[in-house]
């Protein structure tokens, strides 16, 4: 009888212990899942800054996160770097016979430390880029067209550069002349939006034909949401903007203009010739007869010059007729960075490092290789060669036209080009 009671007591105690264990376990798991549910841009706690909080208030609460998040993220990254450096001595093997043995076994401690340092550096650069963007979007003394409007004020037709991948929770705003062809290829593979000749989704970005990459039917973009969701389209956009990881890649604005001119006016392109070269030649050249075809124009050497192209951009009549083409339209008009809080800002100047970091943060770095691209054939060092031939007044007007892109994305003002 005593043994029976003892057995029952042990069973009861064991049951209580298991219940407590399950409660504690699921409480921890639930908390972890809750913390991991948000995008990586909101994963770190922050301290506030009075000056930046005032700036954020001026943005009329456009962003989901506030400056506190950015500041403390920046501080936490600095702290992580200090902690990493303080523990290096513990990680490094002692020199002597033991280090010889470990070298023989293939250990490379310095490589690991360099990788950790590089990742921290890249993360800090990201925080700096996002903080710079947030500061100027909230700076009431810095203005540019469309800055003060809300996301709801953006016309549907201007949301056509925001590509959505629902399978992985990603939104990419593509900017022409900034590696967008390869990023579009990646988005097609991730979203499985295009089938190959065998009827299966493409798995290798490089196998996707170029004409399909730029076909609008290959991508789900925000401007198509009204077809799916009708009157709920804006609500669905806001949900995805809040929950998905949003990124874009940018480039020095003046270098981007050179690249656009070279690809659209120094190569034979019949569509661009009729849509843009003919109007430019008609308005800004002394040509008595504009060639009918691009082939005839190249043969006779009557294609627009870079100077005439800049005149076309500066002429108010140009946008009175229709908006800038996407290849030279300002990034703030394509991607609306003061209305959309981007989680990642990449730059063409650091494309390799930024792409590697982004794919790693998205947990996509093991799925595929980012397509290799031609070495940046339009170099930043070309700026002076191309722009110094323009009148100083034109250069100043052009900078004013693209000033928002320079400032928002942290590109230095080209003072050498803007001084007499």
From Swiss-Prot:
Query: Quick one: which gene encodes this?
Result: chst12
Residues crossing the lipid bilayer are: 6-26
Q: Which Pfam families does its entry note?
A: Sulfotransfer_2 (PF03567)
Q: Which residues are glycosylated?
A: 76, 139, 215, 286, 376
Q: Which residues lie on this side of the membrane: Lumenal?
A: 27-420
Q: Which terms under GO biological process does the entry name?
A: carbohydrate biosynthetic process; proteoglycan biosynthetic process
* Name this polypeptide is given: Carbohydrate sulfotransferase 12
- For this UniProt record, give its keywords in alphabetical order, as a comma-separated list: Carbohydrate metabolism, Glycoprotein, Golgi apparatus, Membrane, Signal-anchor, Transferase, Transmembrane, Transmembrane helix
Cytoplasmic side residue ranges read 1-5
């Amino acid at each position: 009888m005593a043994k029976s009671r003892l057995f029952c007591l042990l069973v009861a105690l064991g049951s209580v212990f298991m219940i407590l264990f399950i409660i504690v376990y699921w409480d921890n798991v639930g908390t972890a899942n809750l913390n991991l549910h948000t995008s990586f841009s909101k994963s770190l706690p922050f301290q506030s800054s009075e000056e930046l909080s005032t700036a954020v208030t001026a943005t009329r609460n456009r962003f989901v996160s506030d400056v506190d998040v950015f500041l403390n993220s920046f501080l936490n990254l600095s702290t992580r770097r200090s902690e990493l450096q303080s523990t290096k001595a513990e990680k490094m093997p002692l020199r002597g016979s033991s280090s010889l043995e470990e070298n023989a076994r293939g250990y490379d401690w310095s490589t690991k430390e360099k990788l950790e340092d590089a990742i921290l550096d890249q993360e800090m650069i990201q925080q700096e880029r996002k903080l710079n963007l947030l500061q100027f979007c909230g700076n009431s003394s810095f203005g540019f067209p469309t800055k003060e409007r809300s996301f709801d004020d953006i016309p549907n037709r201007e949301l056509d550069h925001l590509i959505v991948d629902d399978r992985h929770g990603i939104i990419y705003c593509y900017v022409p002349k900034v590696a967008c062809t390869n990023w579009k290829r990646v988005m097609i593979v991730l979203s499985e939006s295009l089938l190959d000749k065998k009827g299966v989704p493409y798995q290798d970005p490089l196998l996707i034909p170029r004409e399909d990459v730029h076909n609008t039917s290959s991508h789900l973009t925000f401007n198509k949401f009204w077809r799916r969701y009708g009157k709920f389209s804006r609500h669905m956009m806001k949900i995805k903007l809040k929950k998905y990881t949003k990124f874009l890649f940018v480039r020095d604005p003046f270098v981007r203009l050179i690249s656009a001119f070279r690809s659209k006016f120094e190569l034979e392109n019949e569509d661009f010739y009729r849509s843009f070269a003919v109007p430019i030649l008609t308005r800004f050249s002394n040509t008595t007869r504009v060639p009918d075809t691009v082939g005839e124009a190249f043969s006779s050497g009557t294609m627009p010059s870079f100077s005439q192209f800049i005149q076309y951009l500066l002429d108010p009549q140009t946008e009175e007729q229709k908006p800038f083409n996407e290849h030279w339209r300002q990034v703030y008009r394509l991607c609306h960075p003061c209305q959309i809080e981007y989680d990642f800002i990449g730059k063409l100047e650091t494309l390799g490092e930024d792409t590697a970091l982004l794919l790693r943060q998205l947990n996509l770095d093991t799925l595929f290789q980012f397509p290799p691209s031609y070495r940046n054939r339009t170099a930043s060092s070309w700026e002076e060669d191309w722009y110094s031939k323009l009148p100083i007044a034109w250069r100043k007007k052009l900078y004013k036209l693209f000033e928002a892109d320079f400032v928002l994305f942290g590109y230095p003002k080209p003072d050498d080009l803007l001084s007499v």
